[in-house]
Regions:
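Long, low-complexity, Lys/Arg-enriched
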Residues: 1-232
Length: 232
């Protein structure tokens, strides 16, 4: 069981154990490792062939920044008194205070839910995540945008999940401009943000247009990935 997003951990475990089948269950899956049996990979919120709109409104970086353990990342284990103790890369997660606060708030929220239909759980989760991730308020950006995030395996080079970008840097993220930059037609530098929607709202300029363009670019990327999956 893992948050996601490409299934390589499951593939590695299967190869290490030399088992023919190991099933993995994920919050979401953008893609599946090549030559792997897709029936072993189970995505809850979306998978490579399902949930295109949900992917377009989703920020996996924000998800990881919020739904993470308060301890530092485990990088190994050592044996102490016949027990294996995890070794972390830092004393604690730099986001620990807000993570602990969110855990307490989440406990209160869960206890207040009287009736929960597990069959409608995807829709329920979408109603919570979509407005926050794809069209956040300034208050939500102030609350979550300063969480530190790193896409490095060892969690180095921590940055705000909603990077503080200039108007020009936001414009370079728009669908047509970014596509032209990516294929080399325009010579511009792209300044990435782990949560681009948060950066757009934080800047506060041409918000609606930039948010629409961000969704359009994400949808284009995931349609392309879906085509690639089907033509393997």
């Amino acid at each position: 069981m893992d948050s996601g997003w490409v299934g390589t951990l499951q593939q590695t475990i299967r190869h290490l154990t030399q088992k023919e089948r190991i099933d993995g269950f994920y919050f979401g899956l953008y893609e599946i490792p090549k030559d792997e049996n897709s029936s072993m990979y189970h995505g809850f919120y979306f998978d490579p062939l399902r949930g295109l709109d949900r992917k377009s409104y989703f920020s996996n970086c924000l998800f990881e920044a919020v739904f993470t353990a308060p301890e530092g990342m485990t990088v190994g284990y050592e044996c102490q008194n016949e027990r294996y103790i995890p070794i972390t890369d830092m004393e604690e997660n730099p986001n620990k205070p807000i993570i602990l606060e969110n855990i307490e708030l989440l406990k209160s929220y869960i206890s207040s839910i009287q009736n929960y239909d597990i069959k409608g759980s995807v829709t329920f989760v979408e109603q919570l995540l979509k407005p926050l991730m794809a069209r956040p308020t300034m208050y939500e950006v102030e609350e979550f945008g300063d969480l530190l995030f790193s896409d490095d395996v060892l969690e180095g080079n921590l940055k705000k999940v909603a990077a503080e970008l200039t108007h020009e840097e936001i414009v370079n993220q728009r669908f047509l401009r970014k596509t032209l930059i990516m294929i080399g037609v325009l010579k511009r530098e792209i300044h990435e943000s782990a949560w681009i929607e948060g950066s757009i709202v934080r800047l506060g300029e041409s918000v609606d247009r930039s948010l629409r363009s961000a969704k359009k670019y994400k949808k284009f990327v995931y349609i392309r990935k879906r085509i690639q999956m089907r033509t393997r």
